[in-house]
């Protein structure tokens, strides 16, 4: 009996849809799930597909041609380790395990090291695009042994999303945990994008009292210009969706934003690397404070503050918010790609930032027209320290920073919280400052802890007895 070309473990929605995607590209696929019912359900719902169900790990592994290619789509963490442990007794040296889950990159580094020592290949692969992307074409970020990637590249290339220029949204990212790291930063950028959009929405509601229909029209217009992106596109649809009672759905959704922890991972890594990922970190904190609903309701009855006044001319303020949103987005990506650079140096990954931006252009949640500008910036100068220094982004900062400053000033004066817009201004001004007040902090540290300091007029390291 002929062997199957690839196996998929895990038949929850992402695993199921990726298996169907692979099958639709002409590959034969073995499927396995820990619970028999899920596998039977997939087969029953997809008659005529070249999906071969197996109900024991041994039979599943033995059904695959060698070197075996096995895609894991199981719950990250202990579930991934358990799945790997169940496979290992039946694998041969040179077989390839692909982890497509939302896995913490340090776990991927560990698994890659452990499996390599046993003669197996391990490819930690970020997959973005949600359920629809998994089925129709996601953005794929594989990392691991380059030679093993070459053996799975034809399949990954066929199932990936395709950008407008015909390029598949997949590329080899780098060694061990590089793929999952890039996916993690992608998710952090996603947090930043979503919070910036939410703050723009809050400003337009608070400053202009725009109706849902007006908001939808505004976002439709924005989506036809520089802000063209998946998130802007879906947001315009959200504003006009009504429930069964005729209420605008967005207006009756509880204002507590959940999270799965990947934004937190991005911020934690930034702290480990000493990277000022302020905007994305504020977007994580914004979700946390949103979850304090009961406290916020109680505080709203006790803590005073200004009531929002009209922002003035409607068209003028909408344009200011649009410009502020675009520049805020640029700052967020500048921070994210700066962190990728720091991680690449720390973990010896040799990341290609332009290629990373290219694979974000379709299939994934942060897909946006302006990603081509990032690719262009790195093509012009692969070693650029920060995207804000690239000519296009510098020009946008020159043109739009006053709008961002005006919007933040209006928000502060009118009691509208805009943590990520404010973070964008603070980062921009800090990054362009030749001199910061950190000299005083160094003096304080030396005063209470003898931590020493450097001087601008002399070489060396100094300590002062401040009480003399």
From Swiss-Prot:
SUPFAM superfamilies: 6-phosphogluconate dehydrogenase C-terminal domain-like (SSF48179), NAD(P)-binding Rossmann-fold domains (SSF51735)
UniProtKB keywords: Gluconate utilization, NADP, Oxidoreductase, Pentose shunt
E.C. number(s) listed in UniProt: 1.1.1.44
Keyword Oxidoreductase applies: yes
GO molecular function (one): phosphogluconate dehydrogenase (decarboxylating) activity
Family: Belongs to the 6-phosphogluconate dehydrogenase family.
Protein purpose: Catalyzes the oxidative decarboxylation of 6-phosphogluconate to ribulose 5-phosphate and CO(2), with concomitant reduction of NADP to NADPH.
Protein name: 6-phosphogluconate dehydrogenase, decarboxylating
